[in-house]
Amino acid sequence: MASEFKKKLFWRAVVAEFLAMILFIFISIGSALGFHYPIKSNQTTGAVQDNVKVSLAFGLSIATLAQSVGHISGAHLNPAVTLGLLLSCQISVLRAIMYIIAQCVGAIVATAILSGITSSLPDNSLGLNALAPGVNSGQGLGIEIIGTLQLVLCVLATTDRRRRDLGGSGPLAIGFSVALGHLLAIDYTGCGINPARSFGSSVITHNFQDHWIFWVGPFIGAALAVLIYDFILAPRSSDLTDRVKVWTSGQVEEYDLDADDINSRVEMKPK
């Protein structure tokens, strides 16, 4: 873990997460806040159209940034995704901690910038996640779990280097998954499925009501996605010792893509 801490590539990846998170939050939430303007000038703009625009803004921004910085940091841009990849033994504990810090700080910075730019908007929530009227905490938690589960499951499947059947764009597939999560959850919770995104809005607005839902739900969803994919759908043969080595070293060998049996389980070992 100490050796990884000293590497320039490690810190470059952390900075990439920070900068990409700023762009992601600014673009996606900025798009949502922009609804105040067309609604006033164009009365035909409805809630359904608004939800689609928000969903596309979040999904396409993730796809774009994943393509832009994915080769540098992996473009997690979400603590739930980072937790999922940690539990899947693809990153070290140190990297996970630093990524989550970078993501949260990036979200705060972006939301603060948006707060200044959109200060004239009435009732400006800055994209604050909140339970819709009639939705209780248990229901909101369930929505966040399901929305995040499908996202992390998509990330694990799309980035699985054992697969030879993948075609098209991985970042675009993940972006569509983010958009799908928003289409599902936006009417119930405002769609968190990203604790850092929720945290930034709560910090700047000083509103932490029901905020725990937007951490606990995504983290449970991420853990369930790893359980389903790594232990049921596409299990890997790695014991506890190997997993601990990956968590501490952060270095994982490439999958054996030349294996005769591509359906065989692949063991992940640190270098």
Curated annotation (Swiss-Prot):
Q: Which residues lie on this side of the membrane: Cytoplasmic?
A: 1-11, 68-70, 85-92, 156-165, 227-271
Q: Which GO terms describe its cellular component?
A: ankyrin-1 complex; apical part of cell; apical plasma membrane; basal plasma membrane; basolateral plasma membrane; brush border; brush border membrane; dense core granule membrane
Stretches assigned to the Extracellular side: 30-48, 112-135, 184-188, 202-208
| GO terms of biological process kind | ammonium transmembrane transport; carbon dioxide transmembrane transport; carbon dioxide transport; cell volume homeostasis; cellular homeostasis; cellular hyperosmotic response; cellular response to cAMP; cellular response to copper ion
Any one Gene Ontology MF annotation carried by this entry is: water channel activity
Describe the reaction catalysed, as an equation: H2O(in) = H2O(out); nitric oxide(out) = nitric oxide(in); CO2(out) = CO2(in); glycerol(in) = glycerol(out)
Record flagged with keyword Lyase: no
Residues the record lists as Phosphoserine modifications = S249, S264
Give TM segment ranges. 12-29, 49-67, 93-111, 136-155, 166-183, 209-226
Q: What positions does the record give for glycosylation?
A: N42
Q: What is its main location?
A: membrane
- Please give, as recorded in its UniProt entry, the membrane topology of this protein: Multi-pass membrane protein
Q: Which UniProt keywords apply?
A: Cell membrane, Glycoprotein, Membrane, Phosphoprotein, Repeat, Transmembrane, Transmembrane helix, Transport
Under the heading InterPro entries, the entry gives:
Aquaporin-like, Aquaporin_1, Aquaporin_transptr, MIP, MIP_CS
Q: List locations, semicolon-separated.
A: Cell membrane
Task: Tell me where the sequence motif NPA 1 sits in this chain.
Answer: 78-80
Span of the annotated motif NPA 2 = 194-196
Function in brief: Forms a water channel that facilitates the transport of water across cell membranes, playing a crucial role in water homeostasis in various tissues. Could also be permeable to small solutes including hydrogen peroxide, glycerol and gases such as amonnia (NH3), nitric oxide (NO) and carbon dioxide (CO2). Recruited to the ankyrin-1 complex, a multiprotein complex of the erythrocyte membrane, it could be part of a CO2 metabolon, linking facilitated diffusion of CO2 across the membrane, anion exchange of Cl(-)/HCO3(-) and interconversion of dissolved CO2 and carbonic acid in the cytosol.
Q: Domain comment text?
A: Aquaporins contain two tandem repeats each containing three membrane-spanning domains and a pore-forming loop with the signature motif Asn-Pro-Ala (NPA).
Q: What name is this protein filed under? A: Aquaporin-1
Please tell me the species this chain comes from: Bos taurus
